[in-house]
Structures are given as C-alpha cells and as structure tokens.
Amino acid sequence: MPGSALLCCLLLLTGMRISRGQYSREDNNCTHFPVGQSHMLLELRTAFSQVKTFFQTKDQLDNILLTDSLMQDFKGYLGCQALSEMIQFYLVEVMPQAEKHGPEIKEHLNSLGEKLKTLRMRLRRCHRFLPCENKSKAVEQVKSDFNKLQDQGVYKAMNEFDIFINCIEAYMMIKMKS
C-alpha cells in the first residue's frame, strides 16, 4: 500500500510540474495573445460605445487632440512608449475627470477603464508588445493640448477614444508582424 501511495504522489507532482511548465512557457512566448487581440479591441470599442454619444455631444471644439503625429509614433520606433503613455494618460488624467459627469457615465467609464487596464496587463506580460523606455513627443503634445483645453479637454479626449483604439490596433498589428 505505501508503495502505491508513493507512486500516486509522484505522478501527481509530475503532472503538476508539467502543467505549470506548459502554462509559464505559453505565457512567456505569448502564443495566446494574437487570438485574444481582436476580442480585446472589440471589448474596448463596445465599452466606449456606451459613452461615445454623451462625449460627442459635449465636445464643441473643432480641433483634433489625437493627431496623425501620434499615429506615426504608434507605427514607429516609439510605438511602445506612445502606447504605454497614452494608456496611462487616459487612466490617470482623462477618465477620472470624465467620471464626474454623473453616476451612469461613471459606471460605463469604470468598465472601460478596467478593460484598458486588462489590455495593459496583457501587453506587459508579452514583452515584445511593451518593452519600452523612451518618451514620445506626440504624447507630450497630446497632454499639453489636453491641459490647455481645461474643462473641454475631457470631452475632446473621450470623444476621440475610438481614434486611440485605432492607434492601439495599428501598433499591435505591426508588433504581430515582427
């Protein structure tokens, strides 16, 4: 009896090691990431659609906050930093101000923020998507323009969130090819 119990324990431990090894290898090489990418972007777009009309009607300005130079940074060598900084910008500066516009907006923005945090976490786990240190001048310009717009900045930034999602998608597509 003790021999068969020992054998069962050894088999159990071996099975646990194998399953742990497979999980960590899969996590490290990011083989699962491409499959979930389009789903994550769809979730972001769906969550944004819950507040898009509200912010579009409040955005009375003709200027564009998220310009082509930002998209160029996303597509260039600063893509990683631009993405990281823009996620942080929306989570720390834009969304907290946007949440002040009522409990129904706050609820949807919380959901949108959680989805953005999940995306950032997944990108960080897969180092080829977010291995960066340099600063993006385009992101600095977005932040500067946002601050100059004062109270209107939140409407402009949230109204253009779909442009930000498109930038994320362009960046991830480039990284998938490399």
Swiss-Prot record:
SS bonds (residue pairs)? C30-C126, C80-C132
GO MF assignments: cytokine activity; interleukin-10 receptor binding; protein dimerization activity
Q: What is its main location?
A: secreted
Q: Which InterPro entries match?
A: 4_helix_cytokine-like_core, IL-10, IL-10/19/20/24/26, IL-10_CS
Arranged from A to Z, the UniProt key words for this protein are: Cytokine, Disulfide bond, Glycoprotein, Secreted, Signal
According to the UniProt entry, where is the signal peptide?
Answer: 1-18
Subcellular localization, per the record?
Secreted
Do the record's keywords include NADP?
no
What's this protein's name? Interleukin-10
What is the scientific name of the source organism? Mus musculus
Q: What gene makes this protein?
A: Il10
